[in-house]
Amino acid sequence: ILRRLVGSEMCIRDSLMMVPGNQSGEKLVNALLKPSLVAKEESQIKEKAMEVINFLNLSHLKNELAGNLSGGQKKLLELGRTMMVDAKLVLLDEVGAGVNRTLLKDLGTAIEKLNKEKGYTFCMIEHDMDFIGRLCDPVIVMAEGSVLFEGSVEDAKKDEKVIESYLGRG
C-alpha cells in the first residue's frame, strides 16, 4: 500500500517526505511523548523535501501527483529520494531507459551536480554511451558477466570487442 501511495497517489513533495530516515524506535517514543519534537522534525523534513525539489528543478511540479509524472520525471523523483536519506553511494540501473532526450539531459545534470556539489558516488549500468560519456570516466564494458573493456568512453566506442558485442558484425 505504501508503495502505491508513494508511487502514484501523493504529490511529489509528500512522496519525498515519506522516505524513511532514521529507523530507530526513538521516533515512535517521540510521537507518543514529545509531539512538539515530531512537529519540528516534520517541518525540517518538509523543508528538506523542498530543497530537493528545487535542486532537481522540479518546483513547478511540487504539487503534481507522482503517478502523473513522465518516466524521466519519475527518475528525477527517485534521485530525490536518495537525497532525502543522504545516500552517498547510488546504484543506477539503466536510468536513461525510456527517457526522452530533454529529460535525459536534466537527469545527467542532476547526477553531475550531486557528484560535484554533494559528493555522491554513482555506479551506473547503462547502454547509452553518449549519456555515460558525459558522466563517467573511466567506464567498464561487460557482456555476459565478463569485462570486455576498461578505459575511456571514446576508446570504448572504437574497441573491436565492444563493437562486435554491441553492434554485431555487418
Predicted regions and their residues:
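A short, surface-exposed alpha-helical micro-motif characterized by mixed small hydrophobic
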Residues: I132-R134
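Conserved ABC ATPase signature
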Residues: L65-L69
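Single conserved hydrophobic/aromatic residue that forms the stacking wall/gate
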Residues: I1-G7, I12
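Conserved ABC ATPase "signature" region
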Residues: M17, S24-L61, T109-E112
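Catalytic Walker B motif of ABC-type/P-loop ATPase nucleotide-binding domains
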Residues: V90-D93
